[in-house]
Regions:
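Active-site capping/gating regions of soluble enzymes
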Residues: 1-140
């Protein structure tokens, strides 16, 4: 939020310059995502991989819809499976993938502990809402 404020202040002094937080301002290019890394203490401990998978399964049941405004207004324009974006119509996860809703890093898979990355949020998401969604979906 602070970096957005700083960028807006800098650009406000440049005539004719604007900032777009739209997650897909140009159809022919990759959109702008705000991939969000998530872990708990249990996930980072030895044998934490089972907690990662449990968390992802809970997430798939409770907030699988990437069109949710919590992930950013007009994010559906970015989540079309083209340009390495996850589908907004179906929840998926994988190790080292770039086209899934959730990506588990290769190192996390090898170590059997670590974190996962929610690839659904768009550039204009509210980070507080996204973290609250992850917490509420997986920790309760």
């Amino acid at each position: 939020m602070l970096s957005r404020y700083i960028m807006e202040r800098i650009v406000s002094d440049i005539p004719g310059m604007t900032i777009s937080w739209n997650p897909k301002p140009f159809r022919q290019y990759n959109g702008s995502g705000c991939h969000t890394n998530f872990s708990t203490k249990e996930m980072r401990e030895n044998d934490g991989y089972k907690h990662i998978i449990r968390s992802i399964n809970l997430l798939s049941q409770r907030c699988a819809n990437a069109q949710n405004d919590l992930y950013g207004v007009d994010n559906y324009l970015r989540t079309t499976v083209t340009h390495e974006a996850p589908s907004s119509k179906e929840f998926s996860y994988g190790v080292g993938t770039r086209h899934t809703s959730i990506r588990i890093g290769k190192q996390t898979s090898e170590d059997q502990k670590g974190y996962y990355e929610d690839r659904r949020p768009g550039a204009n998401m509210n980070p507080y809402y996204v973290i609250a969604q992850l917490n509420n979906s997986t920790l309760h």
